[in-house]
UniProtKB/Swiss-Prot annotation:
GO terms for cellular component: endoplasmic reticulum membrane; lipid droplet; mitochondrial outer membrane. This is 3-keto-steroid reductase ERG27. GO terms for biological process: ergosterol biosynthetic process. Its EC number is 1.1.1.-. Pathway: Steroid metabolism; ergosterol biosynthesis. It comes from Gibberella zeae (strain ATCC MYA-4620 / CBS 123657 / FGSC 9075 / NRRL 31084 / PH-1) (Wheat head blight fungus). NADP(+) binds at residues 32, 55, 59, 65, 272, 276, 324, 326. In Fusarium, the biosynthesis pathway of the sterol precursors leading to the prevalent sterol ergosterol differs from yeast. The ringsystem of lanosterol in S.cerevisiae is firstly demethylised in three enzymatic steps leading to the intermediate zymosterol and secondly a methyl group is added to zymosterol by the sterol 24-C-methyltransferase to form fecosterol. In Fusarium, lanosterol is firstly transmethylated by the sterol 24-C-methyltransferase leading to the intermediate eburicol and secondly demethylated in three steps to form fecosterol. Keywords: Endoplasmic reticulum, Lipid biosynthesis, Lipid droplet, Lipid metabolism, Membrane, NADP, Oxidoreductase, Steroid biosynthesis. One of its GO terms (molecular function) is 3-beta-hydroxysteroid 3-dehydrogenase (NADP+) activity.
Length: 475
């Protein structure tokens, strides 16, 4: 597999590797995904050296969406370069916004995460290259360029699978549980039964084993993609910054939504929330002893020579955007104003999670992507679910998020430990808890680790099973 084309010289080849940052974002043509790209541009330009290059690789499901995304991110970079007082002050009177724009590159490729054959082909093209932007661009056209590595991959793409809102129930829940709780953990969304991708002719899957649409779009497609991208994510030595896999989860990934006997959520009332619970469990337990027999296989490249040459595995992190006014939520456009108002009011009265707009919601994955590795290691950041959070004054921070059965950091914390939290105001751990939340116990954490081991085994079994079904690996 792989292309035989000779790679062209890329614009970022003019600087050393430490002055390059390669970030792939799935589902990046709108919403949170597009905002992650925008926020990366802002924070990268504000914090990195004036020689450094940012290479954004937003994925979409069509060439037309890729062209729109490239244009949107280029326009955003141009505006940022022209209006940034911080950049002008860093450079001085010799500042030219054109020089700044020339350090931001957008290469958009297409992948449908429900099309597993397409996922394998996408990863193969990116790993072996070269790759190109779709035809039809003005300005910089990246053609036949090679991606030497990936520094960060953000798993943002998702599919909700909702049919609408039960409005009488919504009114009742708001009246009985209060506005903040009811718009943070809404129990009135109506989910469609998750579709079997096997029944969709365009994917050409066999009738069995079943493959759930929501589960594959949210979890399994990303899981397969991550493994296939290991040649770009693994490193040769500890002196190199490891690659980062960043999952985008949800506040709604609560314990009761996942039934391990219905792992793909075919029978549950909330397949999206169930898939996000699986995401939480996988990410938080990836390095725990019980999960290692399966997770070590996942983090090892298939090519033995590649595995020997690059033994340093990528790190896995967990984030969520808080609550934003997204088209993913099943509200008709003519009711969206009311939904946005409810989110605003919730933030005004003290909720840390109602960020309202997608740019604010993009804070946590961008923060993970741009932090020094030593800072993340000191925080033991792989054991924490990092949420995008804001207060009524629109101060935006990352906030540790409670996970049912795990707590905030995978350890028991008594009142004294929680009182020692140095965060201020709504950014403190205990602000914004779900009503009825109980403090985690040692027994809970043991059970969570067991769920992790079972989930990792399930995912690895699925990955190998579908590799064999599709025949995508060389003998």
């Amino acid at each position: 597999m792989g292309s035989q084309l000779i790679p062209a010289t890329a614009p970022w080849d003019s600087v050393p590797a430490q002055e390059q940052l390669f970030v792939l974002i799935t589902g990046a043509n709108s919403g949170i995904g597009l905002s992650i790209g925008e926020r990366l541009i802002d924070e990268f330009l504000a914090t990195r050296s004036l020689r450094s290059h940012l290479i954004l690789i937003p994925t979409t499901r069509s060439k037309s969406k890729s062209l729109q995304t490239i244009k949107a991110l280029r326009d955003y970079a141009r505006k940022a370069a022209q209006t940034s007082q911080a950049l002008q002050s860093r450079v001085g009177s010799s500042y030219r916004w054109q020089d700044t724009v020339a350090r931001v590159h957008v290469l958009s490729l297409q992948v449908d995460l429900c099309d597993l054959r397409g996922v394998y082909a996408f990863a193969d093209a990116l790993v072996h290259g070269p790759v190109s932007n779709p035809e039809g661009l003005e300005g910089e056209y990246l053609k036949n360029v090679r991606i030497p590595r990936l520094d960060t991959v953000v798993f943002n793409a998702a599919y909700g699978g909702w049919s609408g809102v039960n409005y009488p129930k919504a009114i009742w829940v708001i009246l009985t549980e209060g506005l903040v709780q009811s718009v943070t953990w809404p129990s009135y969304k109506m989910a469609l039964p998750t579709a079997r991708l096997n029944d969709k002719a365009n994917y050409d899957y066999p009738k069995e084993p079943p493959l759930g649409e929501v589960f594959t779009a949210c979890v399994f497609g990303h899981y397969v993609l991550a493994h296939e991208l290991l040649p770009l994510l693994c490193r040769q030595s500890e002196t190199e910054t490891p690659g980062r896999l960043i999952w985008s989860s949800s506040l709604e990934a609560i314990e009761r939504v996942l039934d391990m006997s219905d792992f793909q959520g075919f029978k549950c009332d909330g397949p999206y929330e169930s898939a996000k619970r699986v995401t939480d469990i996988l990410s938080l337990t990836a390095t725990l002893p019980a999960s290692l027999p399966s997770s070590n296989r996942f983090f090892t490249p298939d090519d033995p020579a590649e595995a020997r040459a690059k033994p340093i595995r990528p790190r896995m992190y967990l984030t969520h955007p808080g609550i934003v006014a997204s088209t993913l939520f099943p509200v008709p456009w003519f009711f969206m104003w009311a939904y946005e108002l409810a989110l605003l009011i919730s933030r005004w009265i003290g909720s840390p999670w109602h960020n309202t707009d997608s740019y604010t919601g993009a804070k946590s994955p961008v923060w993970i992507a741009l932090q020094e590795q030593s800072a993340l290691d000191e925080l033991d950041a792989e054991r924490i679910k990092w949420g995008s959070s804001s207060n009524r004054h629109m101060q935006v921070e990352v906030k540790k998020t409670e996970v049912e059965g795990w707590g905030w950091e995978g350890k028991v914390e008594d009142a004294a430990a929680l009182n020692a939290d140095t965060a201020v105001g709504v950014f403190k751990k205990t602000v914004g808890r779900k009503r009825g939340a109980v403090d985690v116990t040692k027994e809970d954490i043991v059970k969570f680790e067991e769920l992790g081991a079972e989930s990792w085994k399930n995912m690895e079994d699925m990955r190998h099973e579908w590799e064999n079904i599709l025949g995508v690996k060389k003998a």
